[in-house]
């Protein structure tokens, strides 16, 4: 039985698009489902690009998502090299064979001559079919054209009659009319080969059994099949995926239409949420990569790769009408091409965010801890001698959990106390931490207890305008001071406050809001008693002192 081999063949564009990820993921899942191999090949026939620099975000993005290739850049394999720019001799050999066997020809037509033929066909309301007037099939004909200063491209000599029928694994039977095909260029005048030839040669030489790709390549299939047949290659099976569409639209999703997408409320919320996090860790939000159409956006903000995989898998594929939440192993076990829809799937920012929330809630505390550290370090809320750089992009997505930390705002805390503070904060925050970067919403817990930020409007309302606030807080401070450090828990402080309110005949609103602003500087936030436990007895009392001094 032939081993299933799929491939993802991106051009080094400098970014990894959501649509590209969906193609790569489906190729990966299909290969793994069938105990096969997933190959990464780089289609770098465009000589104008800096391949190494432009390729890095693509490789990093795939690895972050866990879409690991079995062969390709960085890992090698039996068919190396995996860059088209390093396989030019193979393409030239294919061109020479196509010409020698009459399936391709040298063409010396000038651009204006081709345009004149197109214009004539348009005027006659007929399909443009190149006349082949400038085709050279002998050395003598080539010499005559070249004596006129013309340079040749190489074109396929496509059939002009009959039909081609392919059995697409997603779309079923698709029929093409050969008369509608052009004599496509496969080699430029400078000798460089075009994508269509290189793809066919590489797919054959790499033993690709299934070409799973975007539907925009469906129209390329006839010329590629013609090349393969002409070279005596066995054809792979084809599966053309529907494109990923814009939010609430059926137009193809594009990274260049960010301004348009920002008019969509959910898309705008996704971007604004990301910007709040990015600004705190020094990321450039105007950069090309900071765009929800690009995968790196989610990595920078702190989404989980498994959540992105889960959501993207459902852009065009579904197991049934009910099941939605899958881990990667589940997807590998369940994925089949016959469940891929033919219609475009619209990118839904709200649904993606919901998947992230679900996966984040299920993440164990230890994993959350390792992920939020990157943001705390980059925002200088914690520090560590074991970290060479706190520049966000220099830090790994998951930090070692045994790293020794200090808190610049509270240098008296031991590394163990800093870790406990962070872990208690994560637990208390619960579903408020929707992405790892959301830990920065709780920066007040890392601030100095003698100089923490206070919302002045809340302070004025709850402290200045309440004549009884100062006296009540002073007495409450004394009650809290009587609790031993190891007993200073949410349950203990809550019991104390309820007893205090009963004794003073207070309603909760008469003290709880003042207590919150005195200890956290905010009018809203985590559960009051969970917040006190996170701060601990010593820090809580220091904050009381700071607040009472401010009142005085």
What is the meaning of each model-derived region?
Residues 27, 58, 98, 102, ...:
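Residue-level signal for inorganic ion chemistry
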Residues 36-38, 202-207, 255, 285-292, ...:
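Short acidic (Asp/Glu) and glycine-rich catalytic loops that position anionic groups and cofactors
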Residues 1-123, 192, 219-233, 307:
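N-terminal Rossmann-like or analogous alpha/beta NTP/dinucleotide-binding catalytic cores
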Residues 81-85, 188, 206-217, 245-306, ...:
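Conserved phosphate-binding loops in nucleotide/dinucleotide-binding enzymes
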Residues 488-551:
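Charged substrate- and nucleic-acid-binding regions of tRNA-handling and nucleotidyl-transfer enzymes
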Residues 97, 105-106, 110-264, 294, ...:
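Active-site cores that bind ATP or allylic diphosphates and position pyrophosphate for catalysis
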Residues 242-247, 325-336:
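A glycine-rich phosphate-binding loop feature that marks nucleotide/adenosyl-phosphate handling sites
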